[in-house]
From Swiss-Prot:
The keyword Disulfide bond applies. This is Contryphan-Cal4. The cysteine framework is C-C. GO terms for cellular component: extracellular region. It comes from the Eukaryota. Its main location: secreted.
Length: 39
C-alpha cells in the first residue's frame, strides 16, 4: 500500500465517523437550534 492510499483511507474513515456522529445527533434533536446544544 502506498502512503497516498493510506491517507485516502484514513480521510474516508474520518468522514464516515463524522457523518455517523451527525446522524446520531439528528436522531436526538429535531431542529438546528437544539442540535447546537448537543455538540
Amino acid at each position: 500500500m502506498t502512503r497516498t492510499a493510506v491517507l485516502l483511507l484514513t480521510l474516508l474513515f474520518l468522514v464516515a465517523m463524522a457523518a455517523s456522529d451527525k446522524i446520531k445527533t439528528r436522531e436526538v434533536c429535531w431542529n438546528e437550534e437544539e442540535c447546537e446544544n448537543w455538540e
